[in-house]
Amino acid sequence: MKKLLINGKKELSGKISISGSKNAALPILAATILSDKAKLTNIPLVKDIFTMVELLKFIGLKINILKKKHTIEIRNINKNIKTLAPYKLVKTMRAGVLVLGPLLAKHKKAKISLPGGCAIGTRPVNLHLFALKKLGAKIKIKNGYIVAEAKNGLKGANIDFPSISVGATENAVLAAFNANGKTILNNCATEPEVKDLIKFLNTLGGRIKIVGRKILIDGCKKIKKNIIHEVIFDRIELGTYMIAAALVGKKIIFNKIDSKLIQNEIDVLKKMGVKLKAQKSTIEIFKSNNIKKINLSTKPYPGFPTDLQAQIMVLMTRAQGISKIKESIFENRFMHVPELKRMGADIEIKNKTAIIKGPSKLTGAEVMAT
């Protein structure tokens, strides 16, 4: 898709079923390296998923995609597994580095290309490697690859992450899944996607518990076969649609969700004057004319997600008065601001904070997506 042509002033209404979460599906797909046979349902059929499937096929897994059912079937029966993730399959998908943990755990070695750059900021893998070294892996960086080895297997450890990282938490959990002994991970990411990965691993035979920001892992003794797992809904997709509904909706109903996983977003929209009704598995949003100003800061879950920062900023342009949003996760996530200003938004950036003066009447313009 090279361009989208959008004709404005269209009032939206209807029902939307939310897709499965890409950010949950990717680490779970990587986790199937630890399994014998698994079926994953509610899979979103997006580019990163297909890239991860190609990577797993390259490694040696047998995979069948049932597109109409949004289901992927995985068989891990190949004895000649490659413990390599080449650059061509990792450069466009940062989640490729998540095969590092399960390859080390099951096959005691891995050679993984360093991920490519990211437009929204630097996202180093140093915390991934920090955790794996604590578990006993020998790691070196050579010719653009992470070369890791654990000849005698990984051993449980007490790991204190210096900062919260979703990817590093996931890789550490995957690596420690069948490590010898107990592992304690402190200062972990506890996003719903991380919890969904742990739910899959526990179905597989894992013994993993979450207590606050601590994850306790007792090395798995026996893998269960023929497991089925339904991936959770995409809370970022839902949040995006909710904001769109607040902007141009008449009445929109969202299905296939768990409202308690997006309570922060619901609270923010209510504070901004958005009319909505949240139930356990559905949310209704009604036409909202009097949008109120608000000050926000992006934070790790359960705080306001950085992945909805750009979307909520559009809603802020409709608010009466000055709204502010601080980006505390990434250092380069205001690339959408010049494009919104082209459409008529009044936005100023000071350090890590965007100051939005509203209300602004946005008009159609040619803009660039990032």
What are these regions (language model features)?
Residues 1-370:
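Short, structured segments at the rim of ligand-binding sites
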